[in-house]
Amino acid sequence: MQTIIRVEKLAKTFNQHQALHAVDLNIHHSEMVALLGPSGSGKSTLLRHLSGLITGDKSAGSHIELLGRTVQREGRLARDIRKSRANTGYIFQQFNLVNRLSVLENVLIGALGSTPFWRTCFSWFTGEQKQRALQALTRVGMVHFAHQRVSTLSGGQQQRVAIARALMQQAKVILADEPIASLDPESARIVMDTLRDINQNDGITVVVTLHQVDYALRYCERIVALRQGHVFYDGSSQLFDNERFDHLYRSINRIEENAKAA
């Protein structure tokens, strides 16, 4: 099975607090993987390293590779990092859209990497690009909002626009950081349904950080759980049972309660 993301000996320290401890991880083509863990476990930190949004510690042997290209090595970004990022779609909890632009214009931003620079200066997109953007919006059920300002949309609708932008980008990997954290249950279901549809029908690798264990079990075949910066569990979601859940979450809660009591 083709390895899409490879992480070796990744460590990260913030202000003398070690957030990640020598993490090793391989993610394969067409997988949909949930990163789970309590707050502060390192799951979002790990996700942001995968495309070089942040760099790890300068640890000997640390290395991240995406789609066969080095993203970072021993705390330094690769010189051709833009090529890796061009193949990666991002979906963040805070949506990361341009509020003053229309839905269609936000989706067209996904084509900037494949558009001549002089065209991007004037937002001159081809008819073919606009058609692809509309097709992407149709795919996520948002084409009727194409000419509406993105600032008028609900949180769930904005997340679907972000997914359409990743489709427009023709991303081979989608990294989603808490995409349903602030959404109501129905909007969360629609967003996760959309991500799973893209994963299953397009073969796009999806890595998503989640707080909601039930969504991870329902939508992702594989779970990677982090606990205090270490990989606690890496395997089938079907084998992530109540005992593992208890060790992952409740033991952390007991540690925090004991610390407060002290």
Curated annotation (Swiss-Prot):
Keyword entries, A-Z: ATP-binding, Cell inner membrane, Cell membrane, Membrane, Nucleotide-binding, Phosphonate transport, Translocase, Transport
Compartments in which it is found: Cell inner membrane
Membrane topology according to the record: Peripheral membrane protein
Main EC class the enzyme belongs to: translocase
GO cellular component entries: plasma membrane
Chain ranges of the ABC transporter domain: 5-253
A Pfam short name: ABC_tran
Residue positions binding ATP: G37, P38, S39, G40, S41, G42, K43, S44
UniProt entry tagged with the keyword DNA-binding: no
E.C. designation(s): 7.3.2.2
A GO term for molecular function: ATP binding
InterPro entries in UniProt: AAA+_ATPase, ABC_transporter-like_ATP-bd, ABC_transporter-like_CS, ABC_transpr_PhnC, MetN_ABC_transporter-like, P-loop_NTPase
Record note on quaternary structure: The complex is composed of two ATP-binding proteins (PhnC), two transmembrane proteins (PhnE) and a solute-binding protein (PhnD).
Family to which this protein belongs: Belongs to the ABC transporter superfamily. Phosphonates importer (TC 3.A.1.9.1) family.
Described purpose of this protein according to its UniProt entry: Part of the ABC transporter complex PhnCDE involved in phosphonates import. Responsible for energy coupling to the transport system.
Full protein name: Phosphonates import ATP-binding protein PhnC
Organism: Shigella flexneri
Designated gene of the protein: phnC
